[in-house]
């Protein structure tokens, strides 16, 4: 699970930050899941090592332009490139109407099938590896945060030990690898767990934007390995945060602390904190770390690989 920030600015792009979009790369299945798609996202993809042809799912938090204005252009470009892969899009009611209107009035025919799913709180996608759920956040319009939970996996299967027990290779190995109990031809029973190493704990990521401090964020982020949370304003600008229903850096840190996450990655910064102003984002980082020390600032093209088994986390840029 590899997170790449494609846009980290709030509202409008700046010279160094595009508007909201995050890519979650799943190398084991050659897929990319996109979270929000602000204007210019496809340009950011071209500047990265990510392949738009691998995008299989897109999750939209809410219908503000800085989170959706890049979506139709990206879908059109993927279609023009000849990709025949289906794309599933999840977002608020109205997202499907918006995309249909864009396609109609721009005379755009998508080569691939695009399915739009209107979301509501709860589990919205599940397969053998992952569960994705959402919760309502607190913003000026309906907005949802997302939680991506990888399922626990059995530890490494000990083939040598299985051979020593006289277990013949074949389909039975598959059952044992899953931790199941099997009966051998001689009637003896073997517990799969006894042949596997320690269970690999599934990794968890929460994405919360746009929102002010709320219980929905805490619920989504509970015990997450990584919480990606908006930090539009500094603490001293809390009045602006309440007025616009956005978070301060201290609110993001309070969510991380309450949810007992491992790492907080702050994003969605107001352009008012560009270098040269009385406050810049280093001040936001200082404020957040006073509450939740393991806090980092996201920036465009930051890549972070979520480690397995909740090992010590380290940032890496590609």
From Swiss-Prot:
The keyword Zinc applies. It catalyses: Endonucleolytic cleavage of RNA, removing extra 3' nucleotides from tRNA precursor, generating 3' termini of tRNAs. A 3'-hydroxy group is left at the tRNA terminus and a 5'-phosphoryl group is left at the trailer molecule. Its cofactor is Zn(2+). Keywords: Endonuclease, Hydrolase, Metal-binding, Nuclease, tRNA processing, Zinc. Its EC number is 3.1.26.11. Binds 2 Zn(2+) ions. It comes from the Bacteria. It is an enzyme of class 3 (hydrolase). Zn(2+) 2 binds at residues 66-67, 210, 268. The active site is at 66 (proton acceptor). InterPro entries: Metallo-B-lactamas, RibonucZ/Hydroxyglut_hydro, RNase_Z/BN. GO terms for molecular function: 3'-tRNA processing endoribonuclease activity; zinc ion binding. Homodimer. Belongs to the RNase Z family. PANTHER family: ZINC PHOSPHODIESTERASE ELAC PROTEIN 1 (PTHR46018:SF2). Zinc phosphodiesterase, which displays some tRNA 3'-processing endonuclease activity. Probably involved in tRNA maturation, by removing a 3'-trailer from precursor tRNA. This is Ribonuclease Z. It comes from Microcystis aeruginosa (strain NIES-843 / IAM M-2473). The gene is rnz.
């Amino acid at each position: 699970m590899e997170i790449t920030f494609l846009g980290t600015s709030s509202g409008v792009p700046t010279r160094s930050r595009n508007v909201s979009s995050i890519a979650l790369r799943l190398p084991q299945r050659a897929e990319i899941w996109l979270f929000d798609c602000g204007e210019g996202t496809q340009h950011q993809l071209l500047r990265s090592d990510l392949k738009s042809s691998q995008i299989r799912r897109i999750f939209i938090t809410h219908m503000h332009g800085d989170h959706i204005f890049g979506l139709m252009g990206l879908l059109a470009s993927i279609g023009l490139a000849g990709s025949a892969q289906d794309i599933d899009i999840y977002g608020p009611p109205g997202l499907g109407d918006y995309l249909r209107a864009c396609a109609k009035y721009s005379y755009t025919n998508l080569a691939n099938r695009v399915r739009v799913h209107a979301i509501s709180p709860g589990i919205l996608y599940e397969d053998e590896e992952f569960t994705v759920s959402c919760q309502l956040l607190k913003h000026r319009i309906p907005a949802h945060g997302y939680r991506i939970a990888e399922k626990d996996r059995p530890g490494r299967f000990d083939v040598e030990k299985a051979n020593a027990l006289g277990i013949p290779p074949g389909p039975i190995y598959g059952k044992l690898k899953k931790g199941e109990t099997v009966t051998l031809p001689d009637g003896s029973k073997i517990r799969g767990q006894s042949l596997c190493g320690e269970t690999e704990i599934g990794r968890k990521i929460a994405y919360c934007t746009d929102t002010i401090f709320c219980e929905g964020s805490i619920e989504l982020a509970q015990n997450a390995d990584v919480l990606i949370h908006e930090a539009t304003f500094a603490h001293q600008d809390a009045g602006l945060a309440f007025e616009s229903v956005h978070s301060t850096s201290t609110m993001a840190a309070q969510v991380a602390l309450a949810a007992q996450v491992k790492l907080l990655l702050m994003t969605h910064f107001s352009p008012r904190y560009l270098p040269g102003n009385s406050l810049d984002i280093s001040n936001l980082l200082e404020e957040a770390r006073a509450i939740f020390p393991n806090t980092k600032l996201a920036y465009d093209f930051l890549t972070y690989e979520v480690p397995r088994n909740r090992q010590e986390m380290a940032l890496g840029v590609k």
